[in-house]
Amino acid sequence: MPLNDDTIFEIAHHYRFQWEPAQQMHVLLYPEGMVQLPGSSGEILKRVNGTARVGEIVADLEHAFPGADLRGDVIEFLEQAHGKGWIRTKQG
């Protein structure tokens, strides 16, 4: 799937994204289990809300973590998350 700055993602319907106090990290819950999202993966995924464009997610993260060029890492994570079915492109 070609990903660009205007692509909008949302969490796939059978997943629920939340902070898990027991693990002290964000997780994706699904009927068969849980995916742990330590550090940057949780920071990226918490910005996937069905309205934010990829470019906005990158800009927000670079604002939150100044001095870091995060574009490549964010794009790579979003591509992997999409490939694993955790997120899907928002359908208008």
Regions found by a protein language model. Give the residues of each.
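Acidic, low-complexity/disordered tracts enriched in E/D and polar residues
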Residues: M1-K46, Q91
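Long, charge-rich, low-complexity alpha-helical segments
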Residues: G33-G92
